[in-house]
């Protein structure tokens, strides 16, 4: 019986491709979020408190983020957070009311996912602690859209809004930027007195325009 070499070669190529695809599938972990630098199987954020100033002239948010962390793996010795184009002023670990500076460094940047922020957990730290991160965003933040007055409906005041999907929250808050965990949050936002800040959280809709606004989200939401 005559066998066509071309058909045989084609069959071998198909088998090789199938074998390669099986290897890829075997390595895939459906419980892992491949779009975050953080490892939520080792340590998780439970609460986020923001205190931020809005600077329209600089197109910048500045202040601090306070993250309440819970260590899942007792052996883990660092926290890895997602960032993109953030300037970090300082990092501190707070435990039982005591604050101490923390060692930190940026990892290698990625054009799509930003830059991991590695924070060392000192030996002797318990499984629950807070991270205080003083930081500022940049005008290049992919989550923040800054509009001059002429581009707003009223034409008198500037406006800024955030759009964090899909991986852009890390460009205005250093955090575990993943829906794999849920957190509660609160925020204090300071703006020019003529402007009003709003967030998807509990707040007073009749609050006077003082330039300082407070928000609370008691329901855990995707980080």
Label each PLM-derived region with a short phrase.
Residues 85-152:
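A surface-exposed beta-strand-loop module
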Residues 1-7:
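Bacterial N-terminal signal peptides that target proteins for export
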Residues 134-223:
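Extended, low-hydrophobicity, Ser/Thr/Pro/Gly-biased non-transmembrane segments
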Residues 18-62, 154-159, 179:
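N-terminal, polar/Ser/Thr-rich
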Residues 64-87, 173-177, 185-192:
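Surface-exposed beta-strand/loop patches in extracellular or lumenal glycoproteins
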């Amino acid at each position: 019986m005559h066998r066509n070499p071309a058909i045989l070669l084609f069959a071998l190529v198909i088998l090789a491709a199938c074998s390669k695809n099986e290897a890829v599938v075997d390595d895939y972990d459906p419980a892992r979020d491949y779009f975050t630098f953080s490892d939520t199987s080792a340590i998780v954020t439970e609460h986020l408190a923001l205190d931020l100033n809005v600077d329209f002239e600089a197109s910048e948010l500045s202040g601090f983020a306070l993250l309440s962390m819970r260590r899942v793996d007792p052996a883990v010795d660092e926290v890895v957070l997602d960032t993109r184009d953030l300037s970090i002023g300082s990092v501190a670990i707070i435990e039982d009311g005591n604050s101490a500076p923390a060692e930190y460094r940026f990892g290698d940047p990625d054009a799509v996912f930003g830059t991991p922020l590695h924070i060392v957990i000192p030996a002797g730290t318990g499984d629950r602690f807070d991270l205080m991160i003083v930081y500022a965003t940049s005008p290049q933040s992919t989550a923040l859209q800054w509009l001059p007055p002429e581009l707003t409906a009223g034409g008198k005041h500037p406006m800024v809004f955030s759009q964090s999907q899909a991986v852009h929250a890390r460009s205005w808050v250093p955090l575990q930027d993943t829906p794999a965990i849920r957190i509660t949050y609160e925020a204090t936002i300071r703006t020019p007195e003529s402007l009003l800040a709003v967030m998807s959280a509990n707040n007073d809709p009749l609050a006077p325009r003082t330039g300082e606004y407070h928000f609370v989200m008691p329901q855990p939401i995707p980080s």
